[in-house]
Amino acid sequence: GYDGVDKRIDVIATAIKGNLTVRDITNLELAYAPPYSSAKDPVNMAGYVASNILDGLVDVVYYNEIDKLISDGGLLIDVREPMEREMGFIEGSINIPLHEIRERLDEIPKDKELYVSCQVGLRGYLAARILKQHGYNVKNLDGGYKTYSDVYGAPEAAGCAYVDDAGEMHIADHNID
């Protein structure tokens, strides 16, 4: 695993053993050393994410639901930057970068089920909060495009190299418009 994963598993295991709630996890004081971690440890952040879901601040959908939701008429808004989207995207999504959401509200229909996604979930969460505050019924794709593409594989993207399941490298030539 990645550096520090074992320590975070220890913290979560201790929290479980101590009957802590996700709200308790947000308040844990974990040793902070700038060279090794951020001011809010990923364990704290996991607690915040779970608390936000429990408190109804954001509704989520999961990678295995999104394709059907789109095919049933839902609208998926990819809030990543265009350059990120060029590396791959979920079929049927449209791109409105997070920093443009407020200025482009008139382009977003209020009569559709809306879903937002980004790379891993943070910008999607922020977009979902903005849209919800403007009266939209919106859900964030939990784990974002990264989780979706980790499970289903990244589609071919213009000028992007990828490795298939057999370990063969290919250069994608699919045009993304």
Please report, for each region that a protein language model flagged, where it lies by residue.
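A generic structural signal for short
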Residues: G1, Y115-V116
